[in-house]
Amino acid sequence: MNKDEIKNLTALEAESELEWLAKEIARHDVLYNRDDQPEISDAEYDALRRRNAEIEALFPELIRSDSPSHKIGAPVSEKFEKSVHAQAMLSLDNAFSSEDICEFIVRIRRFLRLPATQILEMTAEPKIDGLSLSLRYEKGRLVCAATRGDGYIGENVTANARTISDIPKVLRGEFPDIIEVRGEVYMRRENFQALNMSQQEKGKFVFANPRNAAAGSLRQLDPRITASRKLHFFAYACGEVSETFAASQMEMMKKLKEYGFFINPLTKSFKTLEEIISYYHDIEECRHSLSYDIDGIVYKVNDLKLQMRLGFVSRSPRWAVAHKFPAEKAMALLEGIDIQVGRTGALTPVARLAPITIGGVVVTNASLHNEDYIKGIGHKGESIREGRDIRVGDTVIVQRAGDVIPQIVDIIAEKRPKGASAFVFPHLCPACGSHAVREVGESVRRCTGGLICPAQAIERIRHFVSRNAFDIEGLGKKQVEFFFHIQDEALCIHTPADIFTLQRRQEKALVRLENMEGFGTVSVRKLYNAINMRRKVPLSRFLFALGIRHIGEVNARRLAHAYQNYTAFETVAMAATMPYDKVGEEGNEAWLELTNIEGIGPQVGEAIIDFYQEAHNREVLAALLREVTPLDEENVMTASSPIAGKTIVFTGTLARMSRDEAKALAERLGAKTSGSLSKKTDLLVAGSAVGSKLAKAQGLGVEVIDEEAWLQLIEGSYI
């Protein structure tokens, strides 16, 4: 959508577009910042943010409370302790042309009211494509290392950071009592290639690029793994400091080097726009000769007092900007289209290319995104590439942007061979043969064989045993992978039922489990006890554990409350499939009954139908139900509940229960829960280490209580 198209939007269209953008950008923030698994290139992500900003500029009255313009990064993972940043760890605004940089400098001069004759000195440094890290030193000793997280709360990765040789454990020379040093953790290309070769030889996960490898390596639960990954660190700024120790950005860098940090040797200062742009082009030209990936240049006002005067906007400093490199392109022959099945069942087309070199990297595969993209249709149903589809045998234009997975952006129509036929996207999963369905409004086709599909199996079993599902202690990620890959059929776990037959089957094992490395008599006994304790679970947990698309904890509880027992639910789910096979009153009534439950609409109903229509899933379910019993759901009376009908938001860390447990409890007592604050919020329950929600709640006039008051409020209302 270009600027002219944005200007023609109605208020209703703009509101719908902003809602979609908020959700889409938030999803990609989590994929990039928390999961280290980006689906789109930096250029595509930047385009989404630009579109959001342009629509907000035209319709300021429609700016949402969850607008991406106000957010940084993504929420932290539950795997790590949280660490509150003493000074917010913001991201940078992006620029894409010399004109953008000129405007950036003009804005600074205007804000500071600088006369045209006054020189504005700027620093320039390569923008390292890695993971931002904040290092806190007290009395010269490293006491905390934290990732950016959402900009206010990060993940405490101190133990892992200590294994990186570039990060000093004790500072040298004279330094402030308290100093937070910000910088970038990265992996050199040669180390990245060696790591991937090692991963491949061991049959383990292969990283898409050095940035993902660095982020994944730093965020390991075992510091020994981080230590083995050869990570590096460049310092580029400071957060909180107890005393001033430099007058300029360049002096700060010099001091940090004296303290023992590595500073990028390409960092320089300039006095004119022409010098800055010349530096940008020089670095762009030689970027592939560097030992690490960069995706642009960062410019900063050199004078630290001017930085203080300029301050910040909602998610970035006024005194700095990232000048991004353009995407690199090349032509290639499309030799084939392969379909990969992801851990969530999504069928993703991948282009097989005749080898080409883009930016010094040999490319043989490229992303084709989804079924519509191949046909020449965009995410909103609009025509892309002037409606040209992509066919095997085409000469295609491949783009590599931000050092993420390359993608095909267009074809050379005149080079299409005669007889090239349109690509037919499969309707059956290539991994298990189950039906692959595409929901209305979705661009992705997904495998419905969730409980049987080998491509999804490990992730499905991990979900099945997770804390909010069957909650089986002793079956973590490593154990699930061990039992899935083991060659002995007497010990393998490929379906949920296999978990509950393991103890019986192991009698026929070639080697008993307690005699294997990593296990022992005590740990095996504990594992079997944990499994047997979960042979009876509440219906809501059972439904959630099945991993049916759109059936999260909330919808699982809704269905459990509506049907009370599994037999009643299964009867309706099976009956609702009947309209697919025959037209009948029973089927139609079952469909209406299912989809008229509050919060359960056609989209969720279709997901349930798809799941129960698949014979593979019914077979796996039947085997599971021979081993476990879903307990009937008890009605929860909410008439006397003090929070019935109220909208509640939870923030911070709760001591007596997890936030998920608190939300579930509130909903059982008749309240609605939300992840974001608005004027409709009745109550904010604040734990420790709260972020920005507290101030926002006070601004909106929302009542705020702590965890103790929350427990007193609901005392006697639940068992």
From Swiss-Prot:
Protein name (record): DNA ligase
GO biological process terms, semicolon-separated: DNA repair; DNA replication
Catalytic residue list: K127 (n6-amp-lysine intermediate)
Domain BRCT as annotated: residue spans: 638-719
Organism from which the protein derives: Bartonella quintana (strain Toulouse)
Required cofactor(s): Mg(2+); Mn(2+)
Similarity comment: Belongs to the NAD-dependent DNA ligase family. LigA subfamily.
Gene Ontology cellular-component annotations: cytosol
EC category: ligase
Chain positions recorded as Zn(2+) binding sites: C429, C432, C447, C453
Superkingdom of this protein's organism: Bacteria
Transmembrane stretches, start-end: none
The keyword Coiled coil is assigned to this record: no
Enzyme Commission code: 6.5.1.2
Keyword Transmembrane attached: no
Residues that, per the record, bind NAD(+): D42, A43, E44, Y45, D46, S91, L92, E125, R148, E184, K300, K324
Job description of the protein: DNA ligase that catalyzes the formation of phosphodiester linkages between 5'-phosphoryl and 3'-hydroxyl groups in double-stranded DNA using NAD as a coenzyme and as the energy source for the reaction. It is essential for DNA replication and repair of damaged DNA.
Catalytic activity: NAD(+) + (deoxyribonucleotide)n-3'-hydroxyl + 5'-phospho-(deoxyribonucleotide)m = (deoxyribonucleotide)n+m + AMP + beta-nicotinamide D-nucleotide
Entry keyword set: DNA damage, DNA repair, DNA replication, Ligase, Magnesium, Manganese, Metal-binding, NAD, Zinc
One example GO MF annotation: metal ion binding
InterPro entries: BRCT_dom (IPR001357), BRCT_dom_sf (IPR036420), DisA/LigA_HHH (IPR041663), DNA_ligase (IPR001679), DNA_ligase_AS (IPR018239), DNA_ligase_CS (IPR033136), DNAligase_adenylation (IPR013839), DNAligase_N (IPR013840)
